[in-house]
Regions:
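A conserved ligand/cofactor-binding region detector
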Residues: 1-821
Length: 821
């Protein structure tokens, strides 16, 4: 993309010029951080040319635009990724080397943008990358968090949350766009005005407080096609800059009130909502970015179109999970109150414009809001939801006369709560799950009543990942090898071509090269672990990796209990041949999620004991990688031997880490859950390690009972010993109460939930047996190399390019745009 016009000498001059203008220094005098800034601004200049060209092309072609609304966008670092998509990485690296500079070191100066946390945000980032690379018009819409979720520090084994001040040196790739600022209003009351002549009714919000939503545009560079789409993240600023008169009168609190309101809205991602103030802040955040994004989208539409009724032909809103689903009612408000449409007209437009992606079957994540909070904070939006609910209930009663149980299950407003997923399903024209199993569970279980009433809305879109970041950028050695073996670079935009690697699966030399690349990546990760954890790990050991958000259903607890079991085995039977293992964890726990934080502490306590026991001769190592994020994830995925995907079956909607490991040649050790099911289909059961209950078995136990963990505890001495070690002081320096809650969670029902809610003990023996099979397979070097290569060769389905094309074909109906430069 930048290639045809890339000139080393011109690039070097621009870097020197930027150093001078930005810092009043020469290249010899600046810090690495300053050099990173200088280089980034040169790259941004090149991007802006294509950004402008893209916008001009969009104005000319007038394509339909998808607005992808998400609370999170977990982008990862931009410099290297942008250079890869501009096909300029190699040239820039060489130019910098000629200046005595190292591109990788400069990349390390860039903080990960703190705009997301887990798979939800990373999926959104992959989707934006694919939309731009495939040539579709799209805006990402989110919040410009000042501190993100948090920076994780591990102190004495405990997680500590520190502010992630990612913007302290500015963000060279963003553009502030104050000319597109929008007012967003909260609270107050609604005055109804009647027009006697026309009979029209108007609703006016009064006595509200408001903030100014100011957009920052972040370029999303398509691969080698000159297309640059936009991620628009909103900052909050006070409407009135500073009330000096209040300050002069001594009313300091009032003087900074506006400032504080704006500041708190964009301070952090997912403020702790264990209390009322946290809930209120979360709802404010959601409405803030949704309202601003919709106002901007309507303004953009009206600039070129006169007929508001044709809005669905030019715009679609994809709501990524339940966080942005207030968009349904806000779009209605804008159409009714600002555009002056009648209810039926507004509803017709809204229900052809909004689409909803469901990401979870965990009830806790299907958002609900207390009506008293919602109606006070968003009074007009609440009125609109009341009317949507009233009409929907009438429809249910018409279709299912006398079935009040159905009404109770499907209502949007029920038991003093606003059910956001219900709102999205009722008003959306599409409802999709994110893996085939997940979508089936939604249709048969969680959303069954909705599916029976409106089956045409439901569809599946199995998630995917971008190979450009997770292979090209994260694992350049393997990327070059793939290109060499396929004889083409076309896999970069068509991952299905990876199946061409299957012809090398019996080629001894090719397998050797493949495993040699894996070893080099393990050496790189071992170096990272030594630098950041002070732990020596052997790259010849099996790197068994579980990196993902910490949640009980993801069962990091099962993993570490198994490590405790292995440690017992090695201690008791030192004569047994045991292939050395390194168990690698990376995970953040939500600040208010106490049990998840206990599991982190347990992992670190086990690491302390195991890693410092010289008697086991380094056969077992445990590493907890601090502050897991996109930039260290790339290093981890490239180095993994085993991909731990061990969620309780039926609980993981899809997962995308499983796909990143697969792409990088790590076989899956997992349950038949989420996208694991489809991974096994693609690679073959013989090239994965599957264990545990099926989703049907889990659901059956949950609905009908019949599982008592005490039976397993009493009958299996190995399991009993491991569980008892939680409370006998083995891993807590004699403190028998430190892990009492974890112990109790396995054996006794508490607080309305059953004992061993996530079937850890039920699946333990199956998991341990399957881990033995992993060791057996790994000992057979030839067999393992074939398995690893077949995983990479079978990953073609799991590109986000494929996922996005399915969204385009089935939901969005967009046209491709070509930018000529």
């Amino acid at each position: 993309m930048i290639n045809p016009r890339f000139e080393k000498e011109a690039f070097k001059k621009e870097v020197e010029q930027n150093v001078k203008q930005l810092f009043r220094k020469t290249v010899d005098e600046v810090s690495q951080q300053e050099l990173y800034q200088a280089v980034s601004y040169v790259v941004k200049d090149a991007i802006i040319d294509d950004w402008i060209a893209t916008q001009k092309q969009y104005e000319k072609d007038d394509p339909k635009i998808v607005y992808y609304m998400s609370m999170e966008f977990l982008l990862g670092r931009a410099l290297g990724n942008n250079l890869i998509n501009m096909t300029a990485y190699k040239e820039v690296k060489e130019a910098l080397e000629e200046m005595g500079l190292n591109l990788n070191e400069l990349e390390d100066q860039e903080p990960d943008p703190a705009l997301g946390n887990g798979g939800l945000g990373r999926l959104a980032a992959c989707f934006l990358d694919s939309l731009a690379s495939l040539g579709y018009a799209a805006y990402g819409c989110g919040i410009r968090y000042r501190y993100g979720m948090f920076k994780q520090k591990i102190k004495d084994g405990y997680q500590e949350e520190k502010p992630d001040n990612w913007l302290k040196n500015g963000n060279p790739f963003e553009l502030r766009r104050p000319e597109y600022a929008k007012e967003v209003r909260f609270g107050g009351n609604i005055r109804v005005e009647y027009d006697d002549k026309t009979g029209d009714i108007r609703f006016k919000q009064e006595n509200y407080e408001s903030v100014l939503a100011v957009p920052y545009d972040y370029p999303i560079v398509g691969y080698d096609n000159h297309i640059v789409n936009t991620l628009r993240i909103w900052d909050a600023e006070p409407i009135v800059d500073f009330q000096l008169d209040s300050f002069d009168r001594g009313d300091y609190h009032k003087a900074v009130e506006q400032q504080n309101l704006a500041k708190t809205i964009v301070e952090v991602l997912y403020p702790n909502d264990n209390h009322y103030a946290g809930k209120e802040l979360r709802l404010k955040q959601q409405y803030f970015f949704v309202s601003a994004s919709l106002q901007a989208a309507l303004e953009k539409y009206k600039k070129n179109h006169d007929d508001i009724h044709k809005l669905p032909e030019k715009m679609t809103i994809q709501m990524n999970d339940t966080h942005p689903t207030v968009a349904v009612a806000e779009l209605m408000r804008l159409l009714l109150d600002e555009e002056g449409l009648g209810w039926d007209e507004a509803w017709e437009i809204t229900t052809k414009t909004c689409a909803y992606t469901n990401h979870t079957i965990m009830a806790e994540a299907l958002e609900i809001w207390p009506i008293d909070l919602f109606s006070r904070l968003l009074p007009r939006v609440y009125q609109i939801i009341q009317e949507i609910d009233r009409r929907f209930v009438a429809k249910i009663r018409e279709m299912y006369p006398g079935n009040e149980e159905k009404v109770a299950k499907m209502q949007i407003l029920r038991d003093g709560q606003v059910k956001m997923a219900h709102l999205a399903i009722v008003a959306g024209y599409s409802v999709n799950g994110v893996a085939r199993l997940h979508t089936e569970i939604l249709k048969k279980q969680e959303l069954r009543d909705f599916y029976e009433m409106m089956p045409q809305k439901f569809n599946n879109k199995t998630n995917g990942i971008t190979q450009r970041r997770f292979l090209m950028h994260g694992n350049p050695l393997l990327a070059d090898w793939v290109t060499d073996k396929l004889g083409t670079k076309d896999w970069i935009t068509d991952l299905s071509l990876m199946s061409g690697l299957k012809k090398w699966v019996d080629d001894e030399e090719a397998l050797k090269e493949f495993m040699s690349i894996k070893y080099e990546n393990k050496v790189r990760l071992a170096k990272y672990i030594k630098e950041h954890n002070g732990i020596e790990v052997d790259p010849r050991s099996i790197f068994d990796v579980q990196v993902k958000r910490l949640h009980e259903y993801k069962r990091q607890f099962l993993n570490i209990l198994h490590v405790m079991y292995l440690y017992n085995e090695i201690k008791e039977h030192p004569e047994i041949s045991f292939y050395p293992r390194t168990f690698i964890f990376g995970a953040k726990a939500s600040a208010g999620y106490i049990r998840a934080k206990q599991i982190i502490k347990l992992i670190n306590s086990v690491a302390d004991v195991v890693n410092n026991d010289r008697s086991i001769n380094g056969k077992l190592k445990v590493v907890f990688i601090e502050d897991y994020r996109v930039s260290n994830a790339e290093i981890i995925f490239a180095a993994a031997d085993v991909s731990e995907q061990i969620s309780t079956a039926s609980k993981e909607a899809s997962g995308t880490g499983n796909m990143k490991f697969m792409l990088n040649g790590a076989p899956t050790l997992g349950t038949m859950d989420g996208a694991n099911v489809e991974i096994v289909e693609e690679v073959g059961a013989e090239n994965a390690f599957i264990f545990g209950l099926s989703s049907d078995e889990v659901i059956n136990y949950e609905n009908n009972g019949g599982y008592n963990p005490m039976d397993i505890y009493n009958s299996d001495a190995d399991i009993r010993r491991v569980v008892n070690q939680l409370v006998d002081g083995t891993y807590s320096q004699g403190d028998k109460e430190m892990y009492r809650d974890l112990y109790n969670s396995l054996l006794t029902a508490q607080g309305g939930s059953k004992a061993d809610t996530y079937f850890i003990l039920k699946d333990f023996r199956s998991y341990a047996d399957t881990q033995k099979k992993v060791e057996e397979a790994y000992r057979d070097k030839d067999r393992w190399a074939k398995m690893a290569l077949l995983n990479t060769a079978s990953c073609g389905k799991f590109s986000s390019d494929r996922t996005i094309q399915e969204y385009v074909d089935d939901i969005w109906h967009l046209d491709k745009v070509t930018v000529e430069v």
